[in-house]
Amino acid sequence: MTLIAKPSAGAAQPLQDSYQRFLQLGSRRAPQTLYVHEQGYRSSTINTDAQGMRYSHRAGKRFSVAECTGAGRINLLVGGSTALGVGASCDEHTVASKLSLLTGETWLSLAGCGLNATQELLLFLTHQHRFGQLGHVVVLSGLNTLAQEALVEILAATHDPQHSQAHLAFLNRFNEGVQDTAPARRASLWQQLRHAVAPRQAPQWPTLDALSPADKRLARAADSIGRSLRQWERLLADDHTSLTFILQPLLPWCRETLPAGEQSMLAGLAKQPTNFDRLLGDSYDRQLHSAFFRRIRSQAEPVPCYDMNCMLSSSPVFAEDLFVDRLHFNDQGNNALAKVITAKLGLAQEKHAQRRVPPVRQG
């Protein structure tokens, strides 16, 4: 499942070639984690450490999950590709780096493309031993968990071999919508012969019209997010760490009026929707969004939860081009996110300084 949209003419800020090369490297299966980004990746746009985690910057130094010794108290920005900073022109312009600049403290990116709420928690458990004193943990997330609810239904829909192959192809099209920046390789003679004699088949995609109603999937996703947040709360209860959940922004949930660059970007996406667009396409209704957040907040109690889709409009630059696709941001957008988060954390820390930790609910 891809989280990247194909750059289109007139987009607010097309995703850089480095992101496309980075994602075309794919993801490796590793024990206990579903996705692992390329380790030690180097480019002018995105760089990762020995664990595949992106670097953030503070005061001229870079820090990461694998390289945080001597950073003092650290803070974590947890989530998927938005928290990772896909769309930023360089590591210095991710949300984590902007939070470091605004707060004067080190913020690390504990994020990976495609991770759902449970996988985010598992990623923390995998690396928890690397962290010293934790100040704040901000989970900027929600949409991957929702998208995977549709994906689960697709995979469970049929056991017919032909349809199963289509479903497998759906999963394996990780790079759909990502332009290939590498030069095309000349096909071997055997490949040319096989292509010549093979029957012509149109690309198969699983049908999405048999999915359960969107409100049902949103409810299940909200319950999953709420359970995971209560587990986070229990894990961090003895560490005097502030935990906050922020529902990540989705363009249709954020805006009623689009700036020109984002209008052009959406026109391009309409011609070539990504897997992620297919999985979330029936969830863009604002009433569904409101019910989704309310249920997350109810299920996550007492973890403080906020909705960036509502808060982002408080930014002075909200009317400008911020999105590079429906869920990723350019540099100005990441800076706006960081400023809103900083302001909201100042309120949340005082209000939720003393929290009781309830037992994790079952079901």
Please report, for each region that a protein language model flagged, where it lies by residue.
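Residue-level recognition of beta-strand->loop/alpha-helix junctions
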Residues: 109-111, 247, 307-309
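Solvent-exposed loop/turn segments at secondary-structure junctions
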Residues: 82-84, 113-117, 143-147, 250-253, ...
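Short, amphipathic alpha-helical "lid/cap" segments that border enzyme active or binding sites
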Residues: 117, 121, 222, 226, ...
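Histidine-centered active-site loop/cap adjacent to the catalytic His
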Residues: 37, 296-307, 322-362
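N-terminal secretory targeting modules
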Residues: 1-75, 130-133, 352-363
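Serine-dependent acyl-ester chemistry module
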Residues: 144-294
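Second-shell loop/turn segments in exported
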Residues: 84-86, 109-110, 218-222, 324
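Serine-esterase "nucleophile elbow" of acetyl-processing enzymes
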Residues: 53-113, 117, 121-138, 334
